[in-house]
Amino acid sequence: MIACLDARMGEIYHAAYQKQDGVWHTVSEPALCSPQYLPVLEGTGWVGCGSGFDAYTEALQSAYAGQIKHITHGVSPHARHIASLAMPVFQQGRGVDASLAAPYYIRDKVALKTNER
């Protein structure tokens, strides 16, 4: 599964995962990138989802030509999805104390300056 979210400012949040034996494994770490410079993924049969596929359809289909078998439109991330990814990690004893948990920011710069617009 290739997840691409429109990050605005001409960029996307991109990550790829594969499910094996009921557990999701990261193939491509979450990253902020230009739709023209996407991570290379091996193989075929990928399913794409997220607002990035709506915003940058041509660039994503061109980059992954022949690799994506289906794009699911109208899917947005939800906390329950993250919880399902975290559960196996927690069960393996790799959880962290809630007081130490912190958000993972992919983009530090959240707005363009006036002269950059």
Name what the model sees in each region.
Residues 1-76, 105, 110-111:
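Surface "functional belts" at beta-alpha junctions
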Residues 70-117:
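Acyltransferase
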